[in-house]
């Protein structure tokens, strides 16, 4: 009986030791793997400095699409990446009522392309906007750049880029270093989600506040709905002290409009402020279409950093 018991215990002992050893080895392997991954994350920080090409006030960012170099307007008002030109044979196609509600004849071709920002490549959806070859709009748009690059592609990418635009130095810094934003001083402004323009509260004149969007593709400094400006002008004596004048501006009309047109606007020279970021004698224009936004001219006043990871925009005014 004793011999049988000893034999049974002896036969089971190696399995117990083997199981315990396996657990220890598994624990050590997981620990080493976690340490290696954490260390790899710290070491795989991507930062690239891209020279800015500025044309007609717009910021052009060099982007490689399917091994072709493109100069795309960095447009926070755009939802994705859009190229101007002829239609390309993509697998997917959709028609939007937004630009052709009557005839449904115009389509925006969309497909997956190899897109490179600096030295990082990804396959991203790219849209092709068909433009008539003889249109003045096509000629004007192609004179500015090859297309639009919105803020959303930077948000949707796995690297979650920070983008810092510095027109004074003529550079755009693109990075996935999450510590970088913490080291960047300035005003932080939140936005909600990718398909909504980054917005913030502004102050016009002495007392009027409104929420507006940052549209880096717009050529104006700031536009506010005509009805709002009329209300301020009638009800506020201090706002009347702002220098009002009529002006004619040249609009790059909507992407699918037929021509570029000039329109008369009512403009004001007022104090413009985003919290601590102030611009004296800024030109505030009315917009009959009801679009309220701050355009690309604000880039000439401050270094602006886009932080999609923390959903912030950082304004860093130039030292006077």
Question: Where in this protein do the model-derived segments appear?
Answer:
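Bacterial Sec-dependent N-terminal signal peptides
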Residues: 1-44
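Pepsin/retropepsin-fold aspartyl endopeptidases
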Residues: 40-320
């Amino acid at each position: 009986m004793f011999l049988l018991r000893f034999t049974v215990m002896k036969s089971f002992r190696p399995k117990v030791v083997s199981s315990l050893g396996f657990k220890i080895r598994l624990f050590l392997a997981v620990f080493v793997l976690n340490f290696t991954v954490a260390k790899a994350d710290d070491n795989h920080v991507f930062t690239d400095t891209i020279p800015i090409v500025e044309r007609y006030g717009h910021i052009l960012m060099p982007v490689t699409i399917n091994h072709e170099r493109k100069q795309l307007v960095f447009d926070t008002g755009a939802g994705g990446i859009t190229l101007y030109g002829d239609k390309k044979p993509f697998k997917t196609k959709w028609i939007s009522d937004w630009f052709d509600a009557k005839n449904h004849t115009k389509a925006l071709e969309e497909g997956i392309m190899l897109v490179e920002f600096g030295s990082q490549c990804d396959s991203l959806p790219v849209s092709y906007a068909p433009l008539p070859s003889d249109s003045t709009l096509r000629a004007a748009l192609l004179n500015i750049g090859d297309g639009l690059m919105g803020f959303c592609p930077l948000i949707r990418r796995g690297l979650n880029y920070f983008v810092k635009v510095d027109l004074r130095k003529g550079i755009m810094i693109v990075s996935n270093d999450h510590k970088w934003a913490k080291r960047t001083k300035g005003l932080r402004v939140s936005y909600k989600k990718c398909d909504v323009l980054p917005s913030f509260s502004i102050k016009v004149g002495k007392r009027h506040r409104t929420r507006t969007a940052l549209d880096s593709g717009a050529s104006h400094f700031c536009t506010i709905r005509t009805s709002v400006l009329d209300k301020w002008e009638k009800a506020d004596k201090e706002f009347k002290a702002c220098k009002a004048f009529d002006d004619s501006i040249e609009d790059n009309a909507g992407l699918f409009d037929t021509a570029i047109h000039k329109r008369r606007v009512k403009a004001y020279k007022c104090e413009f402020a985003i919290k601590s970021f102030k611009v004296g004698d800024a030109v505030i224009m009315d917009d009959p279409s009801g679009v309220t936004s701050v355009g690309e001219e604000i880039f000439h006043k401050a270094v602006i950093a886009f932080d999609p990871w923390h959903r912030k925009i950082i304004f860093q005014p130039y030292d006077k």
